[in-house]
Structures are given as C-alpha cells and as structure tokens.
A protein has these predicted regions:
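Conserved donor sugar-nucleotide recognition element shared by glycan-biosynthetic enzymes
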Residues: 45, 182, 205
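Helical element adjacent to the flavin cofactor pocket in flavoenzyme catalytic cores
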Residues: 185-233
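N-terminal Rossmann-like dinucleotide/flavin-binding domain of flavoprotein oxidoreductases
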Residues: 62-66, 70-76, 209-220
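Glycine-rich active-site loop/strand segments that organize a redox cofactor
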Residues: 46-66, 123-141
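N-terminal Rossmann-like FAD-binding beta1-loop-alpha1 element of flavoenzymes
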Residues: 5-35
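Glycine-rich FAD pyrophosphate-binding loop
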Residues: 27-51
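Mobile amphipathic helical/loop "lid" adjacent to a hydrophobic cofactor/ligand pocket
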Residues: 71, 75, 80-179, 195
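Conserved beta-strand segments of alpha/beta enzyme cores
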Residues: 32, 54, 80, 219-222
C-alpha cells in the first residue's frame, strides 16, 4: 500500500477543476496537501474518452475563454483551442434557426432579427442584459438571490425564449434542467459568454484537467480512492 505523507495540512476531496486549482495554490504556497480522487483520472465533470478513433467529451462540452482565473493556471498554448462563432443554432421542431450576437457576428444579424425563436422584446432584452452585465463580478452583486428561471421571468423574457434557448443552453452548463441555479451564477456565466468565446481543445476537454495536473507534484495525488467519512482519527 502506498505510504501517505504524514505532515498534511490540507486534504482536497475531488480532482475536478476546483480541486486541481486548490492543489496548485497549496503547492505554490508550500502548504502540505493531499488530493484524493475516486476515479482513475482527474477532471471530474470535465473529461473525455477515446473510442474507435473518436473523442467523446464528458460533462462540460466547451471551454469559455473569458474565465480569467482558469486561463492563468493553464498553459494556453499547449491545449490548442478551436473556437466557435458566438451564438446558437436552435431546432424549433421544424427547422434550424440562428440566434447570434449581431455586435460580434454581423453576418448573422438578419437571421437573428427574423428568427421567431424569440419576440422583438426578447431580442431587445438580450441586448439590455448583455450591456448591464458587462464587467459583472459576482462578489459585488448585492441584489437578492433567486433562481435563474425566476430571474428570467422577472426580466421579462417570454416562456418560448426561456424554453427554446435559455433552458437547453444553460442546462448544459448548470448540469440541471430546472434552472434552479443561482441567478448570480447565471449572470456571471452569461457575462463571460458575452465577452469570451466558446472553444474546444483539439484533443478534447480532458486536455484541460490534464494540463492543470502538470502543475501538481504526483506524490500529493491519490487516484481511485473514495472518501467515505470525515472525522477525527
């Protein structure tokens, strides 16, 4: 059995992106730590697997280039990001329609304006929301918290816009489809998608946690071990 360090100050449970970031900070500050992960890989909800020559991503499907903290921890030049145009292609049950940001992709301005996924009021509200959340910082938001769904209703978005765009798009980010996630987190994510670009590493999303892992001493990581109890020895 592997011998564990005896002078651990910090135990980090889970080697997802947050756990890896914590481990990197502990190492930078010379704080003894142990990172424990139940799976045989790091990344948590951020990962990939290969089968028959194809890469299949697990959990989160894209990386947002506007996440400053993560960018500062990654070697961005080595993960070879490929970028998507800003916007979304939505199937309304009959045809595909485009909702794009006309301020960042002028070629799609007419397709966006004439899309019946949203009302004219919805389109105006999107632009107003985009403007109001420019430079948004979640720790400076003193507004009353509520669910994302309630926030969208209070902002005036139509049910069709919520069901056809917000729910499917943000369900893939929140990993829950009722939009019960905090409206403050929604505002943070929305603001970042409007300032950055959705991207995909050339070799799949697993490239991101693997890149973070390079900054951590392997002797401080324990894979395929599940934490079942936390208490005094």
């Amino acid at each position: 059995m592997r011998e564990l360090p005896s002078d651990i100050d910090t135990v980090i449970v889970g080697a997802g992106p947050s756990g890896l970031a914590c481990a990197i900070q502990c190492q930078k500050n010379n704080k003894p730590f142990l990172l424990i992960e139940k799976n045989n890989r790091v990344g948590g909800r951020l990962g990939s697997f290969n089968e028959n020559g194809y890469i299949f991503d697990l959990g989160f499907q894209v990386y947002n280039t506007a996440y400053e903290v993560t960018n500062s921890l990654l070697d961005m030049g080595s993960i070879n990001l490929n970028y998507f145009k800003p916007g979304a292609v939505i199937h309304d049950g009959t045809d595909f329609q485009i909702i794009s940001d006309p301020l960042r992709d002028i070629k799609q301005v007419f397709g966006t304006l004439f899309s019946d996924i949203s009302t004219l009021g919805d389109k105006i509200r999107i632009l107003k929301l985009k403007s109001s959340l420019r430079g948004y910082e979640i720790d400076r938001d003193n507004s009353k918290d509520k669910t994302t769904h309630q926030f969208l209703l209070d902002t005036g978005f139509s049910e069709r816009m919520i069901e056809m765009f917000f729910r499917p798009f943000f369900s893939g980010i929140f990993l829950e489809n009722k939009l019960e996630t905090s409206s403050k987190f929604f505002k943070y994510v929305f603001s970042r998608f409007n300032s950055g670009l959705a991207s995909l590493p050339e070799n799949g999303m697993q490239s991101i946690p693997d890149n973070l892992l390079k900054n951590i001493d392997g002797k401080n990581i324990l894979l395929e071990k599940k934490v079942v109890k936390i208490g005094e020895q």
